[in-house]
């Protein structure tokens, strides 16, 4: 806050019952008492509980909620969410329609970073491949690794085509005016597993 920045607390993961009952509120309260601006959530139960204990706290619906249209976003608005982070898979036309249908809800959309080959947080590959659950916010990004692809006993890809599961990264700079015109309120730049220098530089380019 002293640097003129807003503080958003990430609770955008699926929580177990014992975590919700015994840890959630005590975890959030110190941040709230120091002026926390918003909490980013995935779990609907978590969202409702936060609104109960901190009724004036802004709630941002995480991309982990997989909101791909207006109906779900309207429900989230009715439940008290002020902002929705859209799925990366949404088109500009769909985002514009969301803005039209939910004009009071802030829309945040990804503009730069990795593209998951699944819907965000709807993947078990990291659990199987790296022992870390993407559904619990600990994705090891095994889809970004190099793989050999076989058809029966014959390898069918070479070293120049070894990233079989890695989607091309997103860079929305060329269409930034269109994104803003569609009604996007906040631009989201992926920071997971990135260092501060990278995040600062990319942010400065978009600013």
Feature locations, PLM:
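Active-site pocket-lining/capping segments in soluble small-molecule metabolic enzymes
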Residues: 1-67, 85-89, 94-186, 193-207
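Conserved nucleotide-cofactor-binding alpha/beta core module
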Residues: 70-71
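As written
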Residues: 80-81
